[in-house]
A protein has these predicted regions:
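Flexible "arm" and connector segments at domain edges
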Residues: 1-71, 75-121
């Protein structure tokens, strides 16, 4: 399974995951199992974030964990769930951006809490 494209779309990513599952993974885990795995993977991202950007220090065996790799594990399971439930993430993402834009186009610009550094100058 070779991916020659430099830029991978969400649709390509969904297809790549599906091909990988069918070639190497035998079949998808159940949706509920994948939801539990997603929760586990998000926890691994949280662990890195808490140690890298928060107040906790790394445990010796966690020092070399890659945030990018853990984020990709989250993305992988999201892509699996989308494939299993028939969600085209590319279309859903476009619709979601439009929804957010319509709902929030002025909300954040008018939020004085987000401009606190400007008022301190």
């Amino acid at each position: 399974m070779k991916q020659k494209e430099k830029n991978i779309t969400l649709r390509n990513a969904q297809q790549m995951v599906d091909e990988w599952i069918k070639t190497y993974g035998v079949c998808y885990f159940s949706e509920l199992t994948n939801m539990a795995i997603l929760t586990e993977e998000v926890g691994e991202v949280a662990r890195i974030m808490a140690r890298r950007y928060g107040d906790q220090s790394f445990k010796e065996n966690d020092k070399n964990k890659s945030l990018g790799d853990e984020l990709c594990d989250v993305l992988w399971v999201l892509l699996c769930l989308a494939n299993q439930t028939g969600v085209d993430l590319e279309e859903a993402f476009k619709e979601n951006i439009e929804k957010k834009t319509n709902r929030d186009k002025e909300r954040h610009i008018n939020n004085s809490k987000l401009h606190k550094n400007e008022s301190e100058k």
